[in-house]
């Protein structure tokens, strides 16, 4: 049995099937000679050429890439303490003992064969003596089994435990140093989770290298050394010859190993393109549906999968040939040694047992060396990872100063004196150049300027996130470099537009690591107008927030951030565009809290909207890193300089004059060559920049520039508006009607994870508190990925939330009850039935050879004992020739098995992926709103679940056929030779099977618990890194470390149980293997002793069952794998079989030739599928005539964007109808319907491709002239033409970065090119700054000109200058409707919403 595991049961380590390869390799849809079985028979030229080409590419890559830096192996254990060294020494001794046990068994196996051979003596006394000897040997094997149990247990337990202990120290040190780094580190390496993923992956590599891999290496080296010793002790000549053939076997495996690992890396890269296409399509599903590009996405995905064909086929080819030659050479080597062995038997220099022991001891020794060598890859990876981590651990911060001075009292006088500054990640770009600024104590100074003026860099310098390149930053006359860093930051309160919340309670987030009583925290919350909404929560201040808890609206986050600053009671206050992402009502509430906070404090305000800082004590105007103007609002207006220009530009976006614009549909040569910066002090890009040094005008207290120009440079730390806009407690996310997104630097947008609901009582129901109440009353809610709308909870809910959840859960449970049948899986692979037949033939042949080889070897050994002279030579020569022929056939059988089953699996994986992706794109938008169907989750399903289908069928079918034939042939041989011993072997089968299954299930269960703990620990770190600026500003690093160490301690406590459990399971399973072999031996001895079988029969049957034992167990050992992947299999067919609630492909639906554009929402009730308890629209009715432009305004969460979602038919109403030209939308073909609508979203979706492809995404057959005309109409042609590659410029990942305004103009050009009769605009300019907003507004004005039906969602007055009607929403109902003048006369909600645009004289203004 042990022999079979070493030679024919285990795959050599370098030839183990590469799971990652199968997970990414994708055969193409189109025919290929690689997939044609007949193509291979035509010659090997194509294959050889492909291999040669692949090898050449890999060599080129190796030449270009220098070897990575690594630490010495001994340094991996730098964090080990005395207890760790004890664990490693004990574990090493146990590993060596465990590795030696198999070879020791072989030594006794030789004795068993000798005893069996001599037990044929007729002497009764000698026969009894031999029987007693066999019983003793059986007991010896039992003792070996006990030793294996103990040593295996100790080996695994010690190495797992010490690995967890040492890596816990490494993690702790890494995180400690990471949190103390200056911000330039995060600018260089990113702070979006990459650092966290690096530490997680690197620590796992180090843990593997210094724990179980070391134990495995010692184990296998012990097998190697002891194998040589036993081999040479038994028969040194046979051992030496066997050793001489080893390099050929190793070479066969080594060559294939090189190709396999290189091809595995290449195929991962090849699949990355397909994965990117799928992720984009799913992430931007609304845009994809709006432009009806499902077919394009499916075609692109299927085409990109073709790239993996070459590598997938090569992998199957290399795997088949590599395994074939490795096994073939091993079998041929065995034939050679047995043939040579007859000479030593004939000469009396060795007996059969010694030859067998020497032969297999050396073979197992060689395999042990191979397995030991495979650990070097893990050692190298661990050393490389350790270099990266240890380099970080020894890195010192350039701004750390814990030994600096502490001022006795702080007045709050701040001065920037001749400051020069550049970000370390972009040293060639000057941000500040000779900057001077003085902030008097207890005064508020607002910094304004264009993008790239450097204003956003002032706060990081004040917080000492960075140090100036030249110059000084002074606090009360003292250079802040000389001050103790932690003390300095404790004097500064920071409130940002994007406040950070750790995954803690609200109480802990407000305290943020400081010792504060609950009364103090509540008082701070009251001052921040946050106490009321916190108290309304079920758990109040103990409510968990952050990624692992309750989701907060942006307004609520800002209030908590203000409360945090209030509790700090700082002398200096830094406000970084705090209200930039809020709507006007929410802005008013937050501004009141900020006004209280600013009293008596030195304050620096970074502002984008100039209307908010008119009351500041001083306003500092910046341009190109210098201070060019400074004074009060009135002084700067009178000056007529840059501030006046910026204010004029901002006001132009509020009350723009109507510009005569021709209908572009009437003129094919319409030109829009207007200056995009007109009226804003922005020069034409083609104009030369004339920059003169600003001069200080004495006497007026004002800086005046001699000449100004536009600086297009942006600071690395962009402070973009938050993606969520919030109102007061009675209001909610402005993007509650929309899809919450996180903007990334690669121009992609990633949907936020699922956000649970926040229920807050309506203002009418609130108790009296310090917070002002909102005049509106929708509930605060937040929703995950879809266009959420938030409304108050109506008294007539459609269904009970509990009932809904219960029903949903029951439905899912019902779906999970039934697993896909074997025949369902077989149907997927039916097109590859020929490959399956050829692969099955190879698997059957190779599986049968396992017991047949044991049978023939047993016959040779028998001849050693019973034959003499010429008869011995003839018999041994005959059987050795048969063994050699079996070796040759093994090469062919392995090639057939692995090559053709590999092709079958690759095509099956590709087909399943295409089916899944196609099925995903059939589903309605509501399906994607479910947290289980997030873009990341669905992308992972495409990448992994399809390979699980392959693994559950193709790969496992191959093994099952192989092992089944081994079992069948072994049982047939056993039953024919002696049924008694066969029954004993069958009786041990359930024991071995249950042992294997229990071991795998046990290990999986404990590993899952440890992995979950590591995941929770990583969340703590990831939260801190993502919010590193806030963590550092509030000196919360110690709090983060405390939380992280608590998680590590939990992991260590669990690892003790984890290591002991795994060690016990492993050792016990090994014990059963040896013990069952001992039982089989005892029964063999008993059968021979009592005359039930002859000598030759006993030796033959014992060896057959010994060789076949592993094959008997392995098919049953697959059960845990199948059970583990059951959910993945079900997931595949759940997606494929799902029937969408909104059918997109109903060819019988209406496709009328003309669209007049009349839209009506009639008595509509609507709630989002994931939030059925929240009624967003209630009995809602709205009628829009064809060609009419209607603006929809309202507070956050009133249901504005939901209207667009219903018109696009992303969702169907719960009650009522949505009509187009008098017909229900449900009657129209869905793709036809969407093809007649043009959608412009607040956050423009820009795909990672060229500008050209982004524009023609709307119409792929558009000509060059049509595309450029659309860009001109969208005011995009000018900036596109100025780019080096023009329309072929690649944007997004690995391309240029565009401003939000430029992205929006490209998105508008896309809609212009579509030329749809219905235009839907969803707050398209709300997140764009004033400079770009006017240019975008002009493009939108042009877009809606002509006979088009337009629905306009807006909260800016500039968006409503061309509208025919204005509809005001609140709580899912229309509360006001009419023109601007009529609504202004009512002095209602519309007036309150628009008042920040016009001031108190709103009713006197008219929109012309």
From Swiss-Prot:
Gene assigned in the entry: ABCB20
Organism: Arabidopsis thaliana
Tissues expressed in: Expressed in aerial tissues.
GO molecular function: ABC-type transporter activity; ATP binding; ATP hydrolysis activity
Catalytic activity: (indol-3-yl)acetate(in) + ATP + H2O = (indol-3-yl)acetate(out) + ADP + phosphate + H(+)
Family of the protein in this entry: Belongs to the ABC transporter superfamily. ABCB family. Multidrug resistance exporter (TC 3.A.1.201) subfamily.
InterPro entries listed in its UniProt record: AAA+_ATPase, ABC1_TM_dom, ABC1_TM_sf, ABC_transporter-like_ATP-bd, P-loop_NTPase, Type_1_exporter
Region (Disordered), start-end ranges: 14-49, 676-735, 752-816
Name of the molecule in the record: ABC transporter B family member 20
Record's compositionally biased regions (Low complexity): 20-39
Binding site for ATP 2: 1194-1201
């Amino acid at each position: 049995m042990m022999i079979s595991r070493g030679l024919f049961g285990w795959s050599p380590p370098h030839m183990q099937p590469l799971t990652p390869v199968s997970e990414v390799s994708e055969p193409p849809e189109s025919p290929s000679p690689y997939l044609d079985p007949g193509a291979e028979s035509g010659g090997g030229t194509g294959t050889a050429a492909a291999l040669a080409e692949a090898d050449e590419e890999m060599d080129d890559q190796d030449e270009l890439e220098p070897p990575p830096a690594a630490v010495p192996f001994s340094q991996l254990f730098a964090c080990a303490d005395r207890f760790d060294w004890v664990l490693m020494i004990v574990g090493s001794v146990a590993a060596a003992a465990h590795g030696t046990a198999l070879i020791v068994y072989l030594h006794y196996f030789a004795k068993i064969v000798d005893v069996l051979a001599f037990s044929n003596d007729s002497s009764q006394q000698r026969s009894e003596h031999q029987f007693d000897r066999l019983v003793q040997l059986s007991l010896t094997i039992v003792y070996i089994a006990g030793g294996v149990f103990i040593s295996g247990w100790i080996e695994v337990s010690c190495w797992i435990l010490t690995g967890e202990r040492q890596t816990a120290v490494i993690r702790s040190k890494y995180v400690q140093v990471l949190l103390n780094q200056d911000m330039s580190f995060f600018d260089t390496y990113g702070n979006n989770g990459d650092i966290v993923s690096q530490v997680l992956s690197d620590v796992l590599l180090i843990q593997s290298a210094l724990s179980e891999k070391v134990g495995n290496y010692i184990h296998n080296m012990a097998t190697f050394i002891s194998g040589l010793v036993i081999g040479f002790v038994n028969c040194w000549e046979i051992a030496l010859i066997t050793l001489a053939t080893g390099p050929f076997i190793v070479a066969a495996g080594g060559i294939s190993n090189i190709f396999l690992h290189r091809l595995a890396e290449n195929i991962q890269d090849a699949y990355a393109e397909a994965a990117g296409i799928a992720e984009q399509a799913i992430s931007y599903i609304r845009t994809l549906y709006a432009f009806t590009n499902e077919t394009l996405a499916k075609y692109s995905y299927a085409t990109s999968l073709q790239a993996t064909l070459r590598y997938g086929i090569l992998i199957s080819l290399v795997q088949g040939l590599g395994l074939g030659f490795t096994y073939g050479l091993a079998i041929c080597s065995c034939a050679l040694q047995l043939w040579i062995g007859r000479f030593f038997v004939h000469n009396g220099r060795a007996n059969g047992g010694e030859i067998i022991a020497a032969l297999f001891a050396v073979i197992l020794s060689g395999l042990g060396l191979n397995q030991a060598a495979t650990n070097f890859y893990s050692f190298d990876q661990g050393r490389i990872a350790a270099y990266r981590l240890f380099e970080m651990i020894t890195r010192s911060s350039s701004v750390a100063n814990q030994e600096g001075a502490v001022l006795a009292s702080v007045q709050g006088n701040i001065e920037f004196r001749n400051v020069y500054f550049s970000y370390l990640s972009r040293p060639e770009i000057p941000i500040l150049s000779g900057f001077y600024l003085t902030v008097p104590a207890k005064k508020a100074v607002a910094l304004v300027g264009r993008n790239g003026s450097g204003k956003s860099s002032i706060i990081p310098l004040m917080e000492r996130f960075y140090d100036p390149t030249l110059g000084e930053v002074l606090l009360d006359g003292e250079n802040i470099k000389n001050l103790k860093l932690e003390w300095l930051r404790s004097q500064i309160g920071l409130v940002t537009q994007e406040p950070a919340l750790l995954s803690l309670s609200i109480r802990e987030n407000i305290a943020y690591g400081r010792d504060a009583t609950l009364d103090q925290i509540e008082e701070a919350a009251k001052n921040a107008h946050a106490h009321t909404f916190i108290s309304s929560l079920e758990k109040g201040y103990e409510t968990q927030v952050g990624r692992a808890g309750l989701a907060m609206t942006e307004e609520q986050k800002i209030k908590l951030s203000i409360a945090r600053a209030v509790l700090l009671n700082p002398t200096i206050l830094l406000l970084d565009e705090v209200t930039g992402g809020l709507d006007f009502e929410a802005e008013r509430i937050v501004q009141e809290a900020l006004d209280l906070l600013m009293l008596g404090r030195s304050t620096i305000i970074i502002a984008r909207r100039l209307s908010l800082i008119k009351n500041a004590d001083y306003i500092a105007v910046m341009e190109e890193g210098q201070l060019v103007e400074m004074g009060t609002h009135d002084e700067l207006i009178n000056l007529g300089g840059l501030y006046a220009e910026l204010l004029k530009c901002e006001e132009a976006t509020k009350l723009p004059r109507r510009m005569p614009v021709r209908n572009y549909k009437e003129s094919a040569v319409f030109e829009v060559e207007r200056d995009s910066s007109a009226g804003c002090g922005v020069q034409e890009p083609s104009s030369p920049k004339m920059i003169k040094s600003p001069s200080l005008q004495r006497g007026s207290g004002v800086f005046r520039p001699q000449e100004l120009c536009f600086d297009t440079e942006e600071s690395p730390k962009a402070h973009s508006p938050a993606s969520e806009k919030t109102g007061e407690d009675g209001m909610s996310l402005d993007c509650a009607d929309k899809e919450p997104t996180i903007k990334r630097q690669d121009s992609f947008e990633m949907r936020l994870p699922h956000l649970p609901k926040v229920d807050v009582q309506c203002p009418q129901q609130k108790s009296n508190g310090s917070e002002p109440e909102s005049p509106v009353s929708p509930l605060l809610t937040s929703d995950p990925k879809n266009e959420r709308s938030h409304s108050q909870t109506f008294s007539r809910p459609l269904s009970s939330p509990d009932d809904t959840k219960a029903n949903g859960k029951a439905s899912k449970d019902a779906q999970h009850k039934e697993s896909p049948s074997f025949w369902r899986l077989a149907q997927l692979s039916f097109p590859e039935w020929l490959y399956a037949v050829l692969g099955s033939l190879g698997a059957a042949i190779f599986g049968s050879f396992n017991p047949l080889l044991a049978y023939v070897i047993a016959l040779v050994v028998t001849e050693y004992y019973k034959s003499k002279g010429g008869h011995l030579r003839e018999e041994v020569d005959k059987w050795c020739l048969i063994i050699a022929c079996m070796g040759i056939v093994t090469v062919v059988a392995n090639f057939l098995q692995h090559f053709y089953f590999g092709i079958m699996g690759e095509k099956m994986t590709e087909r399943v992926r295409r089916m899944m992706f196609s099925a995903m794109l059939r589903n309605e938008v509501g399906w994607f709103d479910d947290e289980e169907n997030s873009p990341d989750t669905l992308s992972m399903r495409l990448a992994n679940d399809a390979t699980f289908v392959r693994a559950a069928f193709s790969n496992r079918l191959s093994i099952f056929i192989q092992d089944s034939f081994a079992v069948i042939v072994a049982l047939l041989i056993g039953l024919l030779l002696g049924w008694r011993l066969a029954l004993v072997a069958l009786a041990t089968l359930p024991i071995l099977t249950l042992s294997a299954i229990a071991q795998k299930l046990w290990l999986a269960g404990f590993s899952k618990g440890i992995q979950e703990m590591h995941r929770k620990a990583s969340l703590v770190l990831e939260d801190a890194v993502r919010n590193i600026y806030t963590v550092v500003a509030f000196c919360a690093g110690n709090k983060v470390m405390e939380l992280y160490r608590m998680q590590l301690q939990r992991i260590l406590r669990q690892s003790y149980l984890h290591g002991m459990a795994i060690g016990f399971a492993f050792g016990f399973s090994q014990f059963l293997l040896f013990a069952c072999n001992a039982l089989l031996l005892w029964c063999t001895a008993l059968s021979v002793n009592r005359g039930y079988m002859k000598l030759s029969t006993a030796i033959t049957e014992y060896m057959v069952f010994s060789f076949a034992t592993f094959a008997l167990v392995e098919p049953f050992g697959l059960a845990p794998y199948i059970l583990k992947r059951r959910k993945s299999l079900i997931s595949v067919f759940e997606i494929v079989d799902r029937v969408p609630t909104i059918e997109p492909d109903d060819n019988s639906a209406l496709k009328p030739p003309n669209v007049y554009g009349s839209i009506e929402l009639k008595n509509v009730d609507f709630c989002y599928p994931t939030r059925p308890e929240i009624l967003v629209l209630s009995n809602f009715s709205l009628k829009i005539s064809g060609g009419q432009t209607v603006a929809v305004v309202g507070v956050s969460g009133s249901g504005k964007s939901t209207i667009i979602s219903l018109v696009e038919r992303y969702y169907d109403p719960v009650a009522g109808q949505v009509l187009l030209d008098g017909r229900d939308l449900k009657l129209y073909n869905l793709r036809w319907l969407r093809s007649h609508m043009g959608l412009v979203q607040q956050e423009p979706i820009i795909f990672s491709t060229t500008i050209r492809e982004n524009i023609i995404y709307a119409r792929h057959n558009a000509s060059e002239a049509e595309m450029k005309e659309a860009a001109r109409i969208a005011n995009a042609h000018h900036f596109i033409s100025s780019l080096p590659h023009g329309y072929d410029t690649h944007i997004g990942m690995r391309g240029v970065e565009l401003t939000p305004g430029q992205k929006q103009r490209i998105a508008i050009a896309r809609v212009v090119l579509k030329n749809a009769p219905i235009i839907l605009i969803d707050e398209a300019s709300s997140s764009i700054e004033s400079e770009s907003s006017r240019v975008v507004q002009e493009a939108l004005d042009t877009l809606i000109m002509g006979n088009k039906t337009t629905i306009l969602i807006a909260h800016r007055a500039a968006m409503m200058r061309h509208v025919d009607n204005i509809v005001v929403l609140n709580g899912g109902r229309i509360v006001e409707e009419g023109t601007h003048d009529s609504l202004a006369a009512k002095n209602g909600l519309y007036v309150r919403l628009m008042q920040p645009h016009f001031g108190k004289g709103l009713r006197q203004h008219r929109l012309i």
